[in-house]
Amino acid sequence: MIELKNISLSYANSHGDSQLCHIDLTVKKGELIILAGKSGCGKTTLTRVLNGLCPQFYPGTLTGSYLLAGKDALKMPIHQLGTMVGSVFQDPRSQFFTTNTTDEIALGMENIPLERAVMQKRIELVCAQMNIERLLNRRIFPLSSGEKQLIAIASICAMEPKAVSYTHLRAHETLRHL
């Protein structure tokens, strides 16, 4: 499913210092992996490589190979990679584009685009699976940080990507909904 071979990355402003050096990683369908390490060790950078933000939005030099579902992910347009790898960031507010929870969950599917009836079924299914129906049709910004993260996760899961990367999940509260 995900296969990284000899991935190295140096950000454009890093004066040649590598943020990732010769990373090999294979993640099979259905596997869950956890990247753990000290602050600054490259966990977020690796996530940015997986979802295509590096080097497209965070300029730098990326070498090695990255296969996603057997396809060369480094040659995919960012919009295609974005539908295959969903990302939930440390601060979910940074990825919200609406002020309503249901609208936010639907937004990514609107961009695919999917028919309204399909989107509604996916919203209902994902929210039921995560046991977060109580969060539908609410204003986003008064929600707790954990609830915001759950809405971000639901919005990604509703798009049915092949892989999802999470940066800094809020421990047990968020994990029990997955």
Identify the role of each PLM range.
Residues 1-4, 9-22, 54-59, 75-77, ...:
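A short, flexible loop at the N-terminus of ABC-type nucleotide-binding domains that lies
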Residues 153:
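Hydrophobic anchor residue at the start of the ABC signature
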Residues 65-80:
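ABC ATPase NBD Q-loop/coupling interface
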Residues 139-143, 147:
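Conserved ABC ATPase signature
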Residues 117-135:
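Conserved ABC ATPase "signature" region
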Residues 167-174:
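Conserved small/polar residues in nucleotide/adenosyl-binding loops
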Residues 36-38:
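The feature captures the beta-strand-to-loop junction immediately N-terminal to the Walker
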